[in-house]
Amino acid sequence: MSWQRPDGRTAAQLRPISFQRHFTRYAPGSVLVKFGDTHVLCTASVAEEVPPFLQNTGQGWLTAEYRMLPTATQQRQPRETLKVSGRTAEIQRLIGRSLRAALDFHKLGSRTITVDADVLQADGSTRTAAITGGYVALHDAITWLYKQGLLDPAQGSPLRQQVAALSVGIVRGEVLVDLCYEEDSQAEVDMNIVMNEQGALIEIQGTAEAGCFDRSQLLQMLDMAQAGIQELLRAQRETLNL
């Protein structure tokens, strides 16, 4: 029996996507991103310092942190206080790697941008929402640096490319994009794809949760993810008035 998507979407259809910029008052960049019922608050802050391994190089850095509100899921999850879980550490490293691909660190200068992704409500695909919304917050933080006179327009923008991410998987033999939690929990294959606007791959995370998948299915997942990511990139440009 084929899988019927809980919200009635077609296999290649994204959930409703929205970005609410300047969501908080103090962060140079902030956005509330919604992928359907997955809501993530992404903020980007700036510190005029770099990690020890970059001191005296003139290069900047970007790092990311990821957390979930205890009541982001149906059952309350304890806060991660003294030590983050392996899942959290993996996700925040993914977010950091993905967004670092968007930057030219020589043009950023000797400063660090921290992107915080806080999941307010989770219905699957939180990490891909965090990356996609994190780029919007990062873009606004770079704009803030220009307004503060901390970046020289003559040097060119530190932003070298757009970045967005999308989940894709196989549920009951069918390839689907932008999985909700119910679909993710039933998936035989679960993947997260990160790309830029040229369609170049930044990261692929893929796991066969049950059984395996073949090359043709992999290529189909990549093709459907690329089409969906192009929609996300267009949505980013629209919200940023680019």
Swiss-Prot record:
Transmembrane segments: none annotated. Phosphate binds at residues 87, 125-127. Coiled coil: none annotated. Homohexameric ring arranged as a trimer of dimers. This is Ribonuclease PH. Belongs to the RNase PH family. Phosphorolytic 3'-5' exoribonuclease that plays an important role in tRNA 3'-end maturation. Removes nucleotide residues following the 3'-CCA terminus of tRNAs; can also add nucleotides to the ends of RNA molecules by using nucleoside diphosphates as substrates, but this may not be physiologically important. Probably plays a role in initiation of 16S rRNA degradation (leading to ribosome degradation) during starvation. InterPro entries: ExoRNase_PH_dom1, ExoRNase_PH_dom2, ExoRNase_PH_dom2_sf, PNPase/RNase_PH_dom_sf, Ribosomal_Su5_D2-typ_SF, RNase_PH, RNase_PH_bac-type, RNase_PH_CS. Its EC number is 2.7.7.56. HAMAP family: RNase_PH. The gene is rph.
